[in-house]
């Protein structure tokens, strides 16, 4: 993308011990060299991470997923990318290591802007932690693009339970954006989505007008919420 010009590139592909996926009791832990296609082909993906299961076919094309890593996508922080959106919707956790030590950051605090995260330049992402499917919880993903596997015009990841709706929007804002609503206000979902759409700073671009994007939030966003509620 020509946004960086590093003087030194370190190849870590030979570090086989970081190509890992560990299925813990309530989380899935993913190592830094675990490829997106490996995650897509994981036999337990649908039962453990249903939101990621729904979203990962939209991630580029199969040759991209064969080479791209899960943590690479998370750390790149492209606002049109699907995996950062799921990371935020699930409020996962990323572990960063440097000479100063190890620290973890929740997804809520990780994205600062387009292609900008709170990872420092002297840190390496060593592990991603995602919470697995919970009882009485619904998950849904949806995306609108000019053609399948193209950059998203709008993407939606929703997690709902009996208490709240966690609505996450990608591509339209400059970074993945999340808002939570009390499930008691579900009957006002049209008004909530309309207010949310108008409170965003949305501009026309070569792909869609601001009016069209707001309409996507209201209509496709609502359909994604309804799908999530249906899955509870």
Task: Describe these PLM feature segments.
Residues 1-232:
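C-terminal structural segment of proteins
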